[in-house]
């Protein structure tokens, strides 16, 4: 690939040249072609069907095509903290995690390194591979990952496109993400859970409740209820928002979600027709659950 069109921004930047020239033009992700990883370790704080009893083999990539103002992983997603590695090293990391007992390999924010991901998964792994994404994906990229990804873990951050532009620089986010999610579902079908309660394949749609944005969340749940039947996808309502990154620049989101806000959303969910999924407790809204990006496992 000479010019990059891997994500919906379609920057058209020569990312190989970007990293070789001090005056190179950076795309939205701010990265070259070689993967940059900030942490690779067993992670116990994903959904129970992902973390299981031994942990999810989570690989945190640096850089991102969204740069959400409130990102909890801001130092790696926006400041690109991490270590550049080869595709061969990336493959080694997968097997290092599997040897540690990982139930799966969990690729966090890997979209801009799709070429490296495809190269690293030429041979199938003995555990499921999870693609942990913002949801801001192209149909073409999803198609290219067919048979390499068993579990799609997209966010559906916004039903409100103005909010998507304001906080994440993601124009047309809702249509883009919902089209991507439908494509993911067509690729892997209804979710499958094994005898140990671990997810073997399928789609989990995540949504993070933001302060002062109840309608945004309700419309997300409406879309899921309208487009999927029980038994098809899992929904994960996340209650872990704390102001991070540049959230202080936006007073309306520079606070935690109130108990009243969460209760309204939770009640709406229980009446929505969505039957399969997870709800986080309010104790999840803590900086204690943010990983330390110190190069562990890289």
Predicted regions mapped to residue ranges:
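Glycine/Thr-rich phosphate-binding loops of Rossmann-like dinucleotide-binding domains
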Residues: 81, 162, 287
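Positions that flank functional sites
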Residues: 86, 112-113, 284-285
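N-terminal [4Fe-4S]-dependent radical SAM core
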Residues: 1-65, 69, 73-78, 292-296
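Glycine-rich active-site/cofactor-binding loop and its immediate structural neighborhood
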Residues: 62, 67-100, 106
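Flexible, glycine- and charge-enriched loops at secondary-structure boundaries
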Residues: 83, 87, 170, 174, ...
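Conserved AdoMet/S-adenosylmethionine-binding subsite of the radical SAM
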Residues: 92-251
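Auxiliary Fe-S-binding modules of radical SAM enzymes
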Residues: 1-23, 190-298
């Amino acid at each position: 690939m000479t010019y990059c069109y891997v994500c919906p921004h379609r920057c058209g930047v020569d990312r190989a040249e970007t990293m070789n020239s001090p005056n190179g033009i950076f795309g939205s992700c701010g990265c070259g072609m070689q993967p940059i990883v900030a942490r690779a370790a067993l992670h116990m704080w994903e959904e129970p069907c992902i973390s299981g009893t031994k942990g999810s083999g989570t690989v945190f990539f640096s850089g991102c095509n969204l740069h959400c103002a409130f990102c909890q992983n801001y130092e790696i997603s926006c400041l690109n903290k991490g270590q550049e590695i080869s595709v061969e090293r990336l493959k080694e990391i997968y097997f290092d995690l599997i040897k540690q007992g990982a139930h799966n390999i969990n690729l966090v924010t890997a979209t801009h390194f799709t070429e490296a991901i495809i190269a690293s998964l030429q041979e199938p792994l003995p555990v499921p591979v999870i693609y942990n994404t913002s949801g801001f994906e192209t149909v073409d990229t999803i198609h290219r990952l067919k048979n390499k990804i068993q579990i799609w873990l997209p966010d559906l951050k916004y039903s409100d496109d103005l909010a998507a532009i304001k906080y994440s620089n993601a124009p047309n986010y809702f249509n883009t993400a919902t089209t991507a999610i439908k494509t993911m579902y067509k690729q892997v079908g209804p979710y499958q859970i094994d005898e140990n309660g671990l997810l073997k394949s399928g789609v989990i749609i995540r949504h993070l409740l933001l302060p002062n944005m109840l309608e945004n969340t309700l419309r997300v749940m409406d879309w899921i209820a309208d487009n999927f039947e029980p038994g098809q996808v899992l929904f994960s309502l996340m209650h872990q928002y704390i102001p991070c990154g540049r959230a202080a620049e936006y007073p309306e989101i520079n606070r935690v979600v109130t108990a009243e806000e969460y209760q309204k959303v939770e009640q709406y969910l229980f009446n929505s027709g969505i039957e399969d999924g997870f709800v986080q407790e309010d104790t999840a809204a803590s900086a204690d659950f943010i990983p330390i990006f110190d190069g562990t496992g890289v």
